[in-house]
Regions:
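Phosphate/NTP-binding elements of NTP-utilizing enzymes
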Residues: 2-144
Length: 144
């Protein structure tokens, strides 16, 4: 259902479903530093990361440049446009919750015609009943 609605919307707006930056700007919303809900417009570092990532990347000390945001957006986009299993590890419970709320914000701020109620939606698991995708959220380390 989501893909059918998205394909219809894409055809009307000439939006390439393989183009994460365009998808993000059109459909994904985040909270900015002033706590306003705004469109996700990828910055130059985020775009470069998407272009050059290998799939085996480890990002060290990349704070405040948007890597967590672009990775959550990429996983959400992949979960909504195909069938994938993704995992997010937060450094602690607070970080995991913040990342989970970002994912929830992506979903809750989609246009109504693109929203799909998840089969499961709790602190550790979000499923997408229409694509079969799921997102596992946990805490890294011995307490996770």
């Amino acid at each position: 259902m989501f893909l059918q609605c998205l394909s219809t919307a894409s055809a009307k707006n000439s939006l390439d479903l393989n183009d994460l930056p365009a998808f993000a700007e059109k459909y994904l919303r985040i909270q900015d530093k002033q706590m306003r809900t705004v469109a996700l417009r990828l910055n130059s570092i985020q775009r470069r990361f998407l272009r050059e990532r290998t799939g085996r990347d480890v990002v060290l000390k990349a704070r405040q440049v948007g890597i967590s945001t672009v990775e959550q957006a990429r996983m959400f986009w992949r979960a909504r446009t195909g069938s994938v299993s993704t995992m997010t590890l937060g450094k602690d419970e607070e970080n995991k919750t913040r990342l989970r709320l970002m994912w929830q914000g992506f979903r809750d701020n989609l246009p109504p015609e693109l929203q799909v109620k998840p089969k499961y939606d709790n602190a550790g698991l979000i499923t997408h009943s229409d694509t079969g995708s799921y997102q596992v959220m946990n805490v890294a380390g011995p307490n996770g």
